Amino acid sequence: MRADADRDSAETRAAELRARILDADHAYYVLDRPVLADAEYDRLVRELAEIEAAHPELATSDSPTQRVSGAPSERFERVVHREPMLSLGNIQSDGELDEFDARVHRLLGLAGDVQVGYVAEPKLDGLAVELVYEGGRLVQGSTRGDGVNGEDVTANLRTVGRTRANRGVPERLAGEVPPRVEVRGEVLLFKEHFEAMNRQILRAGDEPFANPRNAAAGSLRQLDWRVTARRPLSFIAYEALVPGAEPGGARAGPWAWRTHAEKLEALARWGFETNAENERCEGIAAVKAYRDRMAERRFALPYDTDGVVVKVDDLDWRRRLGAASKFPRWAVAFKYPPQEEATRIRRIWASVGRTGILTPVVDFEPVRLSGAMVSRATLHNEDEMRRKDVLEGDWILVRRAGEVIPEVVMPLKERRTGEERPFAFPAECPICGAKVVREEGEKVYRCTGAACPAQLVGRLTHFAQRRAMDIDGLGDKLALGLVERGLVKDFADLYAVPFPAWQELFSRPRKEERDAKAELPQKSAQNMVDALERSKATTLRRLLFALGIPQVGEATAATLARHFGELARFMDASEDALLAVRDVGPETAREIRAWTEEPQNRRVVERLLAAGVRPAPETVDAGGPFAGKTVVLTGGLAALSRDDAKAEIERRGGKVSGSVSRKTDLVVAGAEAGSKLEKAQALGVRVVGEEEFLRMLEE
């Protein structure tokens, strides 16, 4: 019983962690609006990885530990990378660096005294992109996206660095070049250019960018390339891939490199800027010495950096080392400890979220951390605030590692004067005036107001998010504008907002769009109307998640959708019928039934259907090659995202698992398949490639 309880607790925590990490990924990579500090994000990922290591059966195929974090926006055409653009595993200690070196030795079968050659370089804080050249001419440029699919931003990339020699994207390569080459690197803003750009923004009376990374991403991902052209972006190249010339391929021509250092030399010959701080290191001790030198110089460098990237230099060794589903085994990123600063609290106040939860927010005197000015942090709940013993008026230590929202580390009690006071949660909601309560056994205070505007804004953005109704462009500011103007009181109202109202909401361009064409408000309004129309064709699982039903996260929404099949059956399900659903317990069943019985909720659902929202019934194919089978996905697929492949398998009656065991029926191996493929082969599990997998889907 104890083991079952521990597993249930681990499963619940893993689901919570995945949800927080995926939301943070979406905010960082898609919206260019970070919501977590690096240190907090890394802590959540590590905690999730530890849970999945202790309970392999809980490792889902869509877990953030299994894939690259970004996601392509629907504002741009999708580009499929020939080779996945994987992210790097993060480490933070000498011990982890030694473990990385030992793992390289072990996987290559090298004796412990063999010095592995590494290339070390500063970890750039910008936007990863891929440039494709054919016959020496630029034919396509794309963002990394989710690692398999990126965004086509060719027109924008052609403008990068045109005003600064050797810091741009060449239109044509110099010298002898292969028929096709894929160049990867980082689009970034140097500190001097970032500060100059922000000064111009401030003179115009607008809000400056928080940091160079956000500014670079926002500048590159513009619908109007002329906006990008006016931004002082730079490009630094760090990788080149030539089809057939990688180790194990044809290895023909002068670009059949043996080492990464040779690649960097070729990139420089072709006209790219490479990082002048790159250094080849013999052995891990030399890497540590380089890391220490860079840590001392990091703030003197012309760009922001939060660590050092370490790569095996020998390309044949890289091929042998391969990659896991998310990270290459031949490279790692060593991240510096979060920078810390002392500052003084101005005030503590309570913000109200979509579920009515009041969160204590700390406003403090602005400090510069990791290149950005920050002045706010959250304390999550009253218990954390009391545990850290943070008082209004305190001097505090805050830290940040590249994100917008910092973390309060501790109060500096030795600097207290006696005038500091504990923060007391308000008895009434600061937004709507309704009563605020903290129920017995709960850690949070909640607003009891059913019509609270702050809750409505939160519910609208939840409804619109990518994994729910996927209404591209509907974020916090737009939702607030809708609520303030009285245009929207529930989800269904979104589909009734008239076109002129959307135009009015978009009439003041955002700072990154102020240089765009004059018809931008009309174009933005039309884009929003189109996004709303597209969202009407959804699935039952997405709609159930979007509605914000208590206790119904993504996983539960999918389970409910598969069980009931149709929205009407779900809405009319009794508490007993809900209890019959796998993984739905008594509390969840009660919460769901209370929600579906509420007349206002039923009216909103009816109005959504009347507006044209049509959730496709969840049907399960009882026949076919996947029915009743347990399938594991590994590596990147060119034709489908991991989420789409999982959905197709489940729709055909299969179950997708995150780990390979003797109970696994099938492994689908895409590009750069990792240890799961090796384990499947060792266990004799059937393995199919992407081409055969797509044929099976058509059966």
Curated annotation (Swiss-Prot):
Pfam families: BRCT, DNA_ligase_aden, DNA_ligase_OB, DNA_ligase_ZBD, HHH_2, Nlig-Ia
Sequence positions that bind Zn(2+): C429, C432, C447, C452
InterPro entries tied to this protein: BRCT_dom, BRCT_dom_sf, DisA/LigA_HHH, DNA_ligase, DNA_ligase_AS, DNA_ligase_CS, DNAligase_adenylation, DNAligase_N
Residues involved in NAD(+) binding: D38, A39, E40, Y41, D42, S87, L88, E121, R144, E186, K311, K335
Top-rank lineage group of the source organism: Bacteria
GO biological process: DNA repair; DNA replication
Obligatory cofactor(s): Mg(2+); Mn(2+)
Catalytic activity, as annotated: NAD(+) + (deoxyribonucleotide)n-3'-hydroxyl + 5'-phospho-(deoxyribonucleotide)m = (deoxyribonucleotide)n+m + AMP + beta-nicotinamide D-nucleotide
Record GO cellular component, one term: cytosol
CDD domains in the cross-refs: BRCT_DNA_ligase_like, LIGANc
EC number, as in UniProt: 6.5.1.2
Catalytic site positions: K123
Family: Belongs to the NAD-dependent DNA ligase family. LigA subfamily.
UniProt-recorded name of the protein: DNA ligase
Lineage per the UniProt record: Bacteria, Pseudomonadati, Myxococcota, Myxococcia, Myxococcales
